[in-house]
Amino acid sequence: MSRLLIRGGNRLQGEVTIQGAKNSVLPILAATILTGGSVVLRRCPRLRDVEASIRILQALGCKAGWRGDVLEVDTAGMSGCDVPDALMREMRSSVIFLGAILARCGEASLTSPGGCELGPRPIDLHLSGLRALGAEIDDTGGTLHCKAAKLTGREIVLGFPSVGATENLMLAACGAEGVTVLSNAAREPEIEDLQGFLNTCGAEITGAGTSTVVIRGGRPLHGGTYTILPDRIAAATYLCGAASAGGEVFLRDAREEHLSAVTAVLREAGCDVTGGS
């Protein structure tokens, strides 16, 4: 088990550039499957879960390589639709690949995230939504076997505004004929970022950031270049660290509109927080 040793008592002061958001890049990496081409992702954080997602893509026959904080992905040569169990166990969010693989290949097979038995859990929202689009899913024995000769758009009301389910259904709906309307969708900035990437690659999606997302599916997607959203969680962590240590920090590339809840509390506590380009 790793250990962190912190020797406190010092002011935190200086300038830091905010990395790309992990919670944006993971679904976007899954979305590259839909493009069937070459994608360049800028400001991509080199984190364990990102590397795990790359290994999943490579297991499916895709290519990926780093140039600094730029990640190049080519999914043209994708040759598989099954995610190995060992890779599924590496991160719980790996289920996000299900919708994209199903939309591209018409079938997908993977184990339950984390390798545990399926039961009442947020993944049920993913499965019920995919079934609504026309997928046949056998989820016995802890393995998901999914088939869809044809996905068809329809209105889906999520029982809970799950980020993962919203993202998974957005990906699947890109490969569905007709219009899909996701109601009670998650409204996080990372949903908007996924919409931004998909639209850059030729999709037609509106409403991300609100509780209703509309996907007009059946459009051929293509590769492209996209810059990942700055990580609001990392930015908030630096702000709170500076506040607790009595320091002063400048956050480069942070999005002030995504930090309003944190900055409001810091101002109320007596901190001086300013923003702008």
Task: Describe each model-derived feature in a short phrase.
Residues 1-277:
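Short, structured segments at the rim of ligand-binding sites
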